[in-house]
From Swiss-Prot:
Quaternary structure, from the entry: The 400 kDa hemoglobin consists of a spherical 24-mer arranged as a double layer of dome-shaped dodecamers. Each dodecamer is composed of the 3-fold trimer of the tetramer A1-A2-B1-B2 having one intra-tetramer (A1-B2) disulfide bond and one inter-tetramer (B1-B2) disulfide bond per tetramer.
Extent of the signal sequence: 1-16
Keyword field: Disulfide bond, Heme, Iron, Metal-binding, Oxygen transport, Secreted, Signal, Transport
Gene transcribed to yield this protein: ghbB2
Binding site for hydrogen sulfide: 83
Source domain of life: Eukaryota
Statement: the UniProt record of this protein carries the keyword Secreted: yes
Annotated residues for binding of heme b: 114
Keyword DNA damage: no
Name the record gives this protein: Extracellular giant hemoglobin major globin subunit B2
Disulphide bridges, residue numbers: 20-151
The organism of origin for this protein: Oligobrachia mashikoi
Amino acid sequence: MIALFVLMGLMAAASASSCCSSEDRANVMHNWDAAWSAAYSDRRVALAQAVFASLFSRDAAAQGLFSGVSADNPDSADFRAHCVRVVNGLDVAINMLNDPAVLNEQLAHLSAQHQARAGVAAAHFDVMAEAFAEVMPQVSSCFSSDSWNRCFARIANGISAGL
């Protein structure tokens, strides 16, 4: 009987460590607001470009997935605008974390968009997670990496479903 309780406790701990809890959501929204709020609109392009620079440094082949938006010229208006569009998509998802039904619909929509793009794989979202995990502590004080990782995984797993 004790073994059963130990097993249940371990399962609960494992589940909690991968769940984007209400506390995690609050931390992520606070961290995100510190980086992406309207008060910081002048640095949005730089933040988005930094994420993509980190992505491409981790997976150079991923740059080819963005050839249609001039990824070979990261300072082009076309690519900078795309970077901001991607991060704005994350902004929308983060702001839906407290409304799971709406978030699920949004993630399904984004998933369909990514499924339609040749070459995009679920593994790319792991690399994108690493890129954000590198950049976010630089732009958000008191950054909570554990909360960020759990909630980003919730979003990324929803978008990469079906890839």
